[in-house]
Amino acid sequence: MGGWSSKPRKGMGTNLSVPNPLGFFPDHQLDPAFGANSNNPDWDFNPIKDHWPAANQVGVGAFGPGFTPPHGGILGWSPQAQGILTTVSTIPPPASTNRQSGRQPTPISPPLRDSHPQAMQWNSTAFHQTLQDPRVRGLYLPAGGSSSGTVNPAPNIASHISSISARTGDPVTNMENITSGFLGPLLVLQAGFFLLTRILTIPQSLDSWWTSLNFLGGSPVCLGQNSQSPTSNHSPTSCPPICPGYRWMCLRRFIIFLFILLLCLIFLLVLLDYQGMLPVCPLIPGSTTTSTGPCKTCTTPAQGNSMFPSCCCTKPTDGNCTCIPIPSSWAFAKFLWEWASVRFSWLSLLVPFVQWFVGLSPTVWLSAIWMMWYWGPSLYSIVRPFIPLLPIFFCLWVYI
């Protein structure tokens, strides 16, 4: 019982090849309470055991980092167990496993025929012509360098300025152009969406003004309610589909939409006429005929070059005709008057009245000023829904 036994063992400490199986007995000094060196001496008397010298080094253990009891006892009577700390030099790893640190030498570049075989197909003339391209020179030659073929060695210390100005790859796309290319459409889309939302409120505002004419001095209430389709009190501009006034609301808004489209069409025609794109040639003073072609066919204007469009006066003679520069609004008004007078003969009876009205121009201006002063606030409430259309008209006037 007192010697070493080689029969199989069971339980803790079966693997005898593992040094110090319990993990905290550096010198294998078991306490007598455990029956050391008596009934179970297998570990202390095993001649094949690994003495494991690293177990004598004090380190992080069960008692915390670097904690050593002040006396022996459970850790034995080694110097470390007595609280005597010894500095143990760290054994460096073998050279075979040591990692190489620092910058590795740059490998030798492969020959041009291997890295760029397509370049070998160029002749010397084409190759040198390609090198003259500023984009190619910027890739391979430093700023201010020469193309003599002599390559200066790179300095040991990289300059901050040269690292910024040097180009190591393909030219970077100008981010300012990319930003402006994205911001432009986004701003146009945002402005268009804002104007669209404002324009969509025009029919509702005009519908409210239209229905308010029937309720002077009172709040507008839908008159389409009856016993057959009882609905709650609501405004005539927001009738539900079950209300009999719903069809009238749709009809009013349809008429308002047609009026808005007609207004936009008139503005577009006036704009095109101002640009000289419409064959609008009114009656010429002292003549009863109009020209048959657009104003652009005129070759001899009456008053030289003018920024205003010129309209033809008579049929061309010898390839030339007489043209007069006139305001676009006057030309368009004359065109509409001629078109209407041909189809409605009774309009010719209004000509004397119009001439008399034009002759009273000072009185007309004073009357217009007085009416605007008197009806200005009420007219502003009528014109206010059309204010969002003004930016659109301005953009069309500028860019068309």
Curated annotation (Swiss-Prot):
Residues 2-181, 275-348, 399-400 are virion surface. Isoform M is N-terminally acetylated by host at a ratio of 90%, and N-glycosylated by host at the pre-S2 region. It comes from the Viruses. Its main location: virion. Residues 2-174 are annotated as: Pre-S. Systematic vaccination of individuals at risk of exposure to the virus has been the main method of controlling the morbidity and mortality associated with hepatitis B. The first hepatitis B vaccine was manufactured by the purification and inactivation of HBsAg obtained from the plasma of chronic hepatitis B virus carriers. The vaccine is now produced by recombinant DNA techniques and expression of the S isoform in yeast cells. The pre-S region do not seem to induce strong enough antigenic response. Residues 2-119 are annotated as: Pre-S1. Residues 120-174 are annotated as: Pre-S2. It is found in: Virion membrane. InterPro entries: HBV_HBSAG (IPR000349). GO terms for biological process: caveolin-mediated endocytosis of virus by host cell; fusion of virus membrane with host endosome membrane; virion attachment to host cell. Residues 2-253, 203-253, 370-375 are intravirion. Pfam families: vMSA. Residues 1-20, 88-115 are annotated as: Disordered. Glycans are attached at N320. The chain crosses the membrane at residues 182-202, 254-274, 349-369, 376-398. Keywords: Acetylation, Caveolin-mediated endocytosis of virus by host, Fusion of virus membrane with host endosomal membrane, Fusion of virus membrane with host membrane, Glycoprotein, Host-virus interaction, Lipoprotein, Membrane, Myristate, Transmembrane, Transmembrane helix, Viral attachment to host cell, Viral envelope protein, Viral penetration into host cytoplasm, Virion, Virus endocytosis by host, Virus entry into host cell. A lipid is attached at G2 (N-myristoyl glycine). One of its GO terms (cellular component) is viral envelope. Signal peptide: none annotated. Residues 88-106 have a biased composition (Polar residues). The large envelope protein is synthesized with the pre-S region at the cytosolic side of the endoplasmic reticulum and, hence will be within the virion after budding. Therefore the pre-S region is not N-glycosylated. Later a post-translational translocation of N-terminal pre-S and TM1 domains occur in about 50% of proteins at the virion surface. These molecules change their topology by an unknown mechanism, resulting in exposure of pre-S region at virion surface. Belongs to the orthohepadnavirus major surface antigen family. The large envelope protein exists in two topological conformations, one which is termed 'external' or Le-HBsAg and the other 'internal' or Li-HBsAg. In its external conformation the protein attaches the virus to cell receptors and thereby initiating infection. This interaction determines the species specificity and liver tropism. This attachment induces virion internalization predominantly through caveolin-mediated endocytosis. The large envelope protein also assures fusion between virion membrane and endosomal membrane. The middle envelope protein plays an important role in the budding of the virion. It is involved in the induction of budding in a nucleocapsid independent way. In this process the majority of envelope proteins bud to form subviral lipoprotein particles of 22 nm of diameter that do not contain a nucleocapsid. This is Large envelope protein. It comes from Hepatitis B virus genotype A2 (isolate Japan/11D11HCCW/1998).
